[in-house]
């Protein structure tokens, strides 16, 4: 299973095409729209989210509420397009309009300058329109489809914010997926710790007042995962590696870790490895989950626990120093409309990309042509691993 996305931040809209879904899987536009709505929320979002009311148009691959096994095409309209029709026109425009909203002063930390160099664009709007996090709208749409597939197989995904601007949630126990879903949805910053959430919101407000931005850390937990997804036999078949790539591919994300993550480097092996248990009711489990549900690049049946770190958004309302590519003189960087903090929204994007990789791994391991046989094979596999 794979997908491609297309579209610019201020173009007519965004498109994704998914190939490889099994036939007969229940899927409605509402399954996607509820995830799009979640992405648009969160304390710290900018004015753009007051304009856009993202709704998906499914234009292919589904009939009467079920997938056909053919490619699924989805489109999300950019309502702000009406203000950008000349600037972002697909057709040629009069010469006097060609330089409207031209960007010649790249923003530090963004794709502007290097993208312009790479593709030979003397207007870096050609770069920023595609490199914008607006593209994650359709990544969330694709992830919503993956989450629906996983849900039907008894696999659930939840994300939450662990840290913003140096304020970290004080979590003294592990949370079940359903509990994460319920608690995070009730928080303006998608945080499980109410006290920390208040401090996070204050830091976001302070950053906005100062024309600055702040980043943070998000965590995604996947429960009900069968053992044996991914493989140890080749480096590129390891599922944790694929998830790490997916996390770091999200705009502004700079790293990923599983389980205790980098803390494992500071502990002896006896405090890191998860002891193996067995019971007739549950089969093989682990006493702890320090490795985040992975051993040898494969799921071990414990919940997947992965975290991603997001840098502050590069667009600053008090811009840093840059250089004009025309004159080579020093100027302040360009300013585009942006958020002061998008970490809460990014947790929804992280859910989407993790769900996608897990869904792909499920379809790689089991028959993926028909959804009814897929469900049967997953259940058979669960029983086999329990009895091993």
From Swiss-Prot:
UniProt keyword annotations, A-Z = Amino-acid biosynthesis, Aromatic amino acid biosynthesis, FAD, Flavoprotein, FMN, Lyase, NADP
Q: What Gene Ontology terms for biological process does this UniProt record contain?
A: amino acid biosynthetic process; aromatic amino acid family biosynthetic process; chorismate biosynthetic process
Q: Where does NADP(+) bind?
A: 39, 45
The answer to keyword NADP applying to this record is yes
Catalytic reactions of this protein: 5-O-(1-carboxyvinyl)-3-phosphoshikimate = chorismate + phosphate
What's one Pfam family the UniProt record gives for this protein?
Chorismate_synt
Q: Name one GO molecular function term.
A: chorismate synthase activity
Q: In which pathway is this protein known to take part?
A: Metabolic intermediate biosynthesis; chorismate biosynthesis; chorismate from D-erythrose 4-phosphate and phosphoenolpyruvate: step 7/7
Q: For binding FMN, which residues are annotated in this chain's numbering? A: 130-132, 251-252, 296, 311-315, 337
Q: Name one GO cellular component term.
A: cytosol
Q: What does this protein do?
A: This reaction introduces a second double bond into the aromatic ring system.
Among NCBIfam families, the record links this protein to: aroC, PRK05382.1
Its subunit composition reads: Homotetramer.
Family in the record: Belongs to the chorismate synthase family.
Name by which UniProt lists this protein? Chorismate synthase
* The gene coding this protein: aroC
């Amino acid at each position: 299973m794979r997908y491609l996305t297309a579209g610019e931040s201020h173009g007519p809209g965004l498109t994704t095409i998914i190939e490889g879904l099994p036939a007969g899987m229940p899927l409605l536009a509402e399954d996607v729209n509820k995830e799009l709505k979640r992405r648009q929320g969160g304390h710290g979002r900018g004015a753009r989210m007051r304009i856009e009311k993202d709704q998906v148009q499914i234009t292919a691959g589904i009939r009467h509420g079920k997938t056909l096994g053919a490619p699924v095409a989805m489109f999300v309209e950019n309502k702000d397009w009406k203000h950008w029709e000349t600037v972002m026109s697909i057709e040629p425009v009069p010469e006097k309009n060609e330089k409207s909203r031209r960007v010649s002063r790249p923003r530090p930390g963004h794709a502007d300058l290097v993208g312009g160099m790479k593709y030979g664009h003397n207007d870096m709007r050609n770069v920023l329109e595609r490199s914008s996090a607006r593209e994650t709208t359709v990544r969330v749409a694709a992830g919503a489809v993956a989450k629906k597939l996983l849900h039907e197989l008894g696999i659930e995904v939840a994300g939450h914010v662990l840290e913003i601007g140096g304020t970290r949630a004080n979590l003294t126990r592990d949370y079940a997926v359903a509990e994460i879903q319920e608690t995070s949805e009730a928080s303006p910053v998608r945080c499980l710790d109410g006290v920390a959430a208040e401090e996070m919101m204050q830091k976001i407000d302070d950053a906005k007042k100062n024309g600055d931005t702040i980043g943070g850390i998000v965590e995604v937990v996947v429960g009900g995962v069968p053992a044996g997804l991914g493989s140890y036999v080749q480096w590129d078949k390891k599922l944790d590696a694929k998830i790490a790539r997916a996390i770091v591919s999200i705009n502004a994300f700079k790293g990923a870790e599983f389980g205790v993550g980098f803390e494992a480097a500071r502990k002896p092996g006896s405090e890191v490895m998860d002891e193996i248990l067995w019971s007739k009711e549950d089969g093989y489990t682990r006493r702890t989950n320090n490795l985040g549900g992975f051993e040898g690049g494969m799921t071990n049946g414990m919940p997947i626990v992965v975290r991603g770190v997001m840098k502050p958004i590069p667009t600053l309302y008090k811009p840093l120093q840059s250089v004009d590519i025309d004159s080579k003189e020093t100027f302040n960087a360009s300013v585009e409309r942006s958020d002061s903090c998008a970490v809460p929204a990014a947790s929804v994007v992280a859910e989407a990309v993790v769900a996608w990789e897990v869904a792909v791994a499920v379809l790689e391991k089991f028959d993926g042509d028909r959804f009814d046989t897929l469900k049967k094979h997953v259940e058979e596999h669960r029983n086999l691993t329990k009895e091993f």
